[in-house]
Regions:
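Fe(II)/2-oxoglutarate oxygenase catalytic core
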Residues: 2-487, 493-556
Length: 556
């Protein structure tokens, strides 16, 4: 502030010095009075602007302080709400940058220096965009109303977090940038609704209506686009783009009516009756059947288990054929599905073990990769949104302890195991339908690891998830829901060594909560195979058993 005042006074003195000998002329002196009056007005405006800046900063600081007190009490529970996660990305990437610009000219050099330095470690534009798209993905997968998300009323939430007009507008704008006019319409409409309800915002109705009219037009609804454009012009009659759009939409409407009349006349002349159905364009391609089934199963719909098949599923105490480790204290085993055969082990991992694995993995997390069948290399993919870390028994004896537990329960040896992969799924994180084994068209899928194919999959669940997070099998209509302290297990290969395509599965996005997982590729040469899987391995048979441990927990 002092620097700005010095610059202002310097400019003023230079201006005054251009007119010297004022005392020799009352006329000149009277001019000075008016000059001084203008100076005072300018000075007061400067003070008003600075006070306004400080008031904005103070108000923003108070809001953040209140938010931080709530968030720090349970950081992971707080960020388990996807809106909170999105707003955190938005605050750190956009709003803190706006604050930096606001106070940059002030004398708070220490704050600016610290903020500038810290911003190097802040989320990027890509992070903000990614969080926004995650919200849109959750909205589609779980059929959530826009207002439900905007008001924070998600199922099972502890911390409700309403979205502002700016938040909704930002989602709509990101969708618009992707030519996703369906979601653009949804979120611009929500922004407009909140503005109509009297919410104060830096975003005006004209800007929102401009996006909204174009999004509706792109979906083929000329009449609605025309109505929105007329409303925009009622607020700003000089809006050039809207005036041009109005003429264009009216022309298109006339052309459309003319085409419809010609088509109707042609049908009458040909003596046929046409039945026309209008279908709203959503701005994206119709999902493939697997995608539909995947999303239905994630919502708990479309599960294809009949009562007769259900009656053949049982629970039992299991010791893996009198394994010494479980002879006196067998584990609880439950049949989850028959084809493919999936079993669940109850009370198989403790809370302290979960926390230990998380603490080991957190500093090592990097963006997860998948095998590209075209290049044969590992690469990132949009269908797998997570970060991964790698752990071994050298990092902590617990890793070996968990591996030994799996070996004792499955009878499969893991002496030549690769490192264990730990994955963390972020907001809306998912792993879309995939196979855990290599197909015939991927003979070199695991060549770089020096392994055979993946025989089986093991999953640990670490919390009871309030909403989302299921493991689903679209081809057979199966869904397995997370339950704290349990693990599920299935084989990916038939006895012949051929892949079981019914094991194609997916990790549904977690709607509320955080999801952690760890996987491990292991050579397998010999060992006992359960009776329900009559698959004999010889000393020379080389397969890879794939253990994936899904840790669903709140990161602290």
């Amino acid at each position: 502030m002092r620097l700005q005042l010095c610059i202002f006074l310097s400019f003023l003195l230079k201006s005054l010095s251009a007119h010297n000998d004022f005392y020799t002329s009352i006329g000149h002196m009277t001019d000075l009075l008016f000059t001084e009056k203008d100076m005072v007005t300018s000075l007061k405006e400067y003070i008003r602007v600075e006070e306004s800046k400080l008031e904005q900063v103070k108000r923003w600081a108070d809001q953040l302080e209140s938010l931080s007190i709530t968030a720090i009490q349970d950081p992971e529970g707080f960020l388990g709400h996807p809106v909170n996660a999105f707003k955190l990305m938005k605050r750190l990437n956009t709003e803190w940058g706006m604050l930096e610009t606001l106070v940059l000219s002030d004398t708070t050099e220490a704050f600016i220096s610290n903020l500038t330095m810290q911003r190097k470690h802040f989320p990027t534009e890509d992070d903000q965009t990614g969080a926004a798209k995650a919200l849109l993905r959750l909205q589609d997968t779980y059929h959530l109303e826009t207002n439900t998300i905007a008001t924070g009323n998600l199922p099972g939430v502890t911390y409700k977090s309403p979205m502002t007009v700016e938040d909704c507008y930002e989602l709509g704008k990101i969708a618009y940038s992707d030519s996703d006019y369906y979601h653009t319409e949804l979120w611009m409409s929500q922004s407009l609704q909140q503005l109509d309800q009297g919410e104060e915002s830096t975003i005006d109705k004209v800007t929102v209506l401009d996006y909204l009219s174009y999004a509706i037009y792109q979906q083929g609804e000329l009449e609605r686009a025309l109505e929105i454009t007329k409303r925009l012009l009622s607020l700003d009659s000089e809006h050039q783009r809207a005036r041009g759009n109005l003429k264009y939409f009216e022309f298109q409407m006339l052309q459309q009516r003319s085409d419809e009349e010609e088509a109707a006349q042609k049908q009458r002349n040909e003596g046929t009756v046409g039945n026309k159905t209008e279908e709203k364009k959503k701005g994206f391609k119709e999902p493939i059947p697997e995608r539909k089934m995947y999303e239905k199963l994630c919502r708990g719909e479309g599960i294809q288990m009949t009562p007769r098949r259900q009656s053949r599923l049982f629970c039992r105490y299991y010791d893996n054929h009198r394994n010494p480790m479980y002879l006196l204290s067998p584990v609880k085993q439950e049949d989850e599905w028959d084809r493919p055969y999936i079993v669940r082990y109850h009370d198989i991992i403790s809370h302290s073990e979960i926390e230990k694995v998380k603490s080991l993995a957190k500093p090592r997390l990097r963006r997860a990769t998948v095998h590209d069948p075209l290049t044969g290399k590992l690469t990132t993919a949009l269908y797998r949104v997570s970060k991964s870390a790698w752990l071994t028994g050298y990092d902590d004896p617990l890793i070996d302890k968990i591996n030994q537990r799996i070996e004792d329960l499955t009878g499969l040896e893991m002496d030549t195991a690769e490192e264990m992969q730990v994955a963390n799924y972020g907001v809306g994180g998912q792993y879309e339908p995939h196979f855990d084994f290599g197909r015939k068209d991927e003979p070199d899928a695991f060549k770089e690891l020096g392994t055979g194919n993946r025989v089986a999959t093991w999953l640990f669940y670490m919390t009871d998830v309030a909403a989302g997070g299921a493991t689903v099998f679209p081809d057979v209509g199966a869904a397995v829901w997370p339950k704290k302290g349990t693990a599920v297990f299935w084989y990916n290969l038939f006895a012949s060594g051929e892949g079981d395509y019914s094991t194609r599965h997916a990790a549904c996005p977690v709607l509320v909560g955080n999801k952690w997982g760890k996987s491990r590729d292991i050579y397998y040469y010999r060992g006992y195979v359960p009776e329900k899987y009559p698959f004999t391995l010889t000393e020379t048979t080389c397969y890879c058993i794939y253990f994936e441990v899904s840790l669903i927990s709140n990161l602290k």
